[in-house]
Amino acid sequence: MSLWPNRSRNWRVHCDCRGFNLDRHVSEINERILEGDAAVFTADEIKDMVRDGDVPSADEVDVVTTATCGVMSGTAAVMHLRVSEPGSFRKAASVELNGIPAYPGPCPNENLGSVDLFIYGTGHSREDPDYGGGFLFRDLLLGSEVEVRVTSVEGRVVESTVTMDDIETARIVGTRMAFRNYTALVNPGETPVKSIFNAFEMPENCGGLSFSGCGDINPLENDPSMETVHQGTGVLLNGARAIVLGEGTRSSPIKPNLMLSGDLHDMKPRYIGGFRTAAGPEIFNTVAVPVPVTSERVLENLMVLNSDIKLPVADVRDRSRVITEITYEDVWSGDVRPVHHPERCTDCAVCLAARRCPTHAIDNGLDLDRCFGCGVCAWSCPSGAYEMDTGTVRIGELAVPIICRQSDRLRARELSLELKKLIENGDFLMG
């Protein structure tokens, strides 16, 4: 059965979950937004209220902004860009951007000197194995020049450089985004394992745990049956207004995710970028989704806390093999960002923290704008120049350290706050 029933703007929910019958149209909430009277909270604010025992009623909350940030492999861009003068080549047979293969078409743009193309966020540069599509998209947003190489069907090579301003069309399409949280992984084997699920080889004998998921602020954790999130819902994708196209690939009632699209031109480099792993570069994105409170049931779903959310721990060699189960409280109780102590640096011949940093945040210091809060630097530096408590979890008799976070609650919180402000200003309506 589809998770996306037909819903209109005036879709109505009748619910009397706690003795209070809320019957509210989304259009009524939009009226309050336009009048400047809407009560809008971030998911973080709601969770703090729940922990403090100050649980709001449904008539006291109009919208809650939820968000997640993490590695999202199902990311691609659709682009149209001019390469050379019309007539210089018939059509493209292959295209590369900064050495990353792109896929020309489907429109041939015959003799126009331009190309339509798809390029994957997980694409790897032929010239630099640490550079991929996520880094490329961020570089474009920063205004950097990008090298374009087209090989035509006639065998002619055409090279040029472009910036974001030169690319007429650039849309991100997320085929699988904002999973309802995810999985933690360990390696119970006797040899290290290369995987996209860790920034470096997963240590043997359950020597470390990596995980994904922003826990109780995750959009679909707060609307697990998708009562308010549906095809056509407006969201923020990496800071840009975007839209839910429908279910993402591999979406299921238990593990739903979203297919999204937004204009790359409008995105912010803070929220999208590359993430190096032991198996090559990946891409991270940030998604914020509004949840209009149309019923008591919707509000009750928003009361979920990290301690309520199960996090399966699986074998990285076979992710279908679940070893145990913990909660998101177990993995999100530590520090959000590392602290740099330069006086502790012993000038190692090879700085493991810099070599392993997934976002290139370490270069003669710590760039907190690039930092993802993954914790890899603290785990890797033998002299303690980078300090961060990411916590440990129990797996049987073992105390297993958390060595890599592939999600970032700080960026997620920032984008949920941006969305809250847009709604409060009357600039973002529910759909």
From Swiss-Prot:
Biological source species: Methanothermobacter thermautotrophicus (strain ATCC 29096 / DSM 1053 / JCM 10044 / NBRC 100330 / Delta H) (Methanobacterium thermoautotrophicum)
Entry keyword Transferase: no
Membrane-spanning residues: none
Keywords assigned by UniProt, alphabetized: 4Fe-4S, Iron, Iron-sulfur, Metal-binding, Repeat
The UniProt record lists the keyword Transcription: no
Classification lineage: Archaea, Methanobacteriati, Methanobacteriota, Methanomada group, Methanobacteria
All residue ranges annotated as the 4Fe-4S ferredoxin-type domain in the record: 336-367, 362-391
Signal peptide: none
Domain of life, per lineage: Archaea
InterPro entries attached to this UniProt entry: 4Fe4S_Fe-S-bd, 4Fe4S_Fe_S_CS, HcyBio, Methan_mark_16
Cystine bridges: none
Protein name: Uncharacterized protein MTH_1684
GO terms of molecular function: 4 iron, 4 sulfur cluster binding; metal ion binding; oxidoreductase activity
